[in-house]
Curated annotation (Swiss-Prot):
Origin species: Mus musculus
InterPro entries: FLVCR1-2_SLC49-like, MFS, MFS_dom, MFS_trans_sf
Protein's name in the database: Solute carrier family 49 member A3
PANTHER family attached to this UniProt entry: MAJOR FACILITATOR SUPERFAMILY PROTEIN-RELATED (PTHR10924), SOLUTE CARRIER FAMILY 49 MEMBER A3 (PTHR10924:SF6)
Family indicated by similarity: Belongs to the major facilitator superfamily.
Chief location category: membrane
Gene3D superfamilies reported in the protein's UniProt record: MFS general substrate transporter like domains (1.20.1250.20)
Amino acid sequence: MAGTMDRLEDCNSPETSGTAGDALPSPRVYARRWVFLLVVSLLSCSNAMLWLSFAPVADTIAQHFFLSMDQVNWLSLIYFVLSIPFGMAAIWVLDSVGLRGATILGAWLNFSGSVLRAVPCLPVRIPSPFAFFMSGQSLCALAQTLVVSSPAKLAALWFPEHQRATANMISTMSNPLGLLIANVLSPALVKKADDIPMMLGIYIGPAALACLLATVCLWESVPPTPPSTGAANSTSESFLRGLKLLIQNKAYVLLAVCFGGGIGVFSSFSALLEQILCASGYSNEFSGLCGALFIVFGILGALLLGLYVDRTKHFTEATKIGLCLTSMTSVAFALVSQLQGQTLALAAICSLFGLFGFSVAPVVMELAVECSFPVGEGASAGLIFVLGQAEGMLIMLLLTALTVRRTGPSFSTCQQGEDPLDWTVSLLLLAGLCTLFTCVLVIFFNTPYRRLEAESGGSSSPTMCARDPRTVSPTQVPPLETPGLTPPDEALKEAPGPASVSKGHSEWAETMPRDV
């Protein structure tokens, strides 16, 4: 079994590329990269389930535990609050301690938080259930800072160039998959207040499994040899130096601020969907269905778009088109969600909102790495996440603050005794912010693909497994001056011996953080 997992795949396959003439060993891939991807994906899915588990049944939770809706909303908001200060620490952990150590730490935090949330449901009297809910959610929020920054780094360190976007898509879309499960599972499980303990207990299961697999199955942060030329240099900058380079990179800052705002819009939409729709007369089950459609079509779109950009490398074009379509859909949702009886229209709009919006998330993470190379993937993806959470917290607070109580006839299905909220102004603001971020990104964002250019320039053999001629620098080089091609009479002089290959292997290992 171990021999199969450690088997190097043949260089003639599309999964390996490299030359014997480089100082570093020839790029190779390992089958056990899929195990790492499975663990990270399961952990991300479980963490998202825990984040959104209260939101689809917010009114029932508030009624059973004598909480206000503001308190229930804070169980989601705490993810935003803690991600801002601890997100930077998570970036340091990923780039300094290593991917394996960060994943194991995140798994244990996630599992501990899931258990702590269930304490108020024990058969003994708990004086302050909200304190346990908040403590458990806080631990899960700390785990999220480590989880969401991992996909880009995992893809870069373990996967070859033509699989990076797909690997990033799988691990990134595991998070909305968790949101989907929570949107469907929570309303299905909680028909009455007595069902809440069962719901909280079920959510412990995936967290426990992810913790077990992370502890037992992850052996190292990086493979023995890099899967691509760019992987060997991906963490060449120190943590503080990398952050400085990111802040000075205008294209990256623009991408981070605009897409961070998009993350905030989508996070607020997911957390508040049930409250928005119940005020217009829609049931919790229908709200869960809309949330499920939102995520299912998002995952489908991400799969198709990930495969497309893996082949074409059209990161910028795919991002801009996807965000434009997302903005138009957000306007439609703001208008239709305030009407009664529009179940088919709302279901279609939520499906399109997810299809266009969620699908660009893994593409943007790859684009962030491309425009910020050689800064570490943990820093480039993590900083976008931190900004997204900060903007998401501000947007969510602003949306809830702008709501007012309806005084006229009501079709509300919300279970609280107070008059339902009017979300009209809040939803128009949400659509306006989504459109603003999109316009700024479409008009002003442009960047070269630095990592692809570095890998193209570093190829020293015509047999390198290049995926597409459009991925190289547009500058044409005469055939006799192609970088890396050695005249036949000098080939033997420059071919490295075993010592030089061993030295290159050592240099790759020394640039990577140690396992913990």
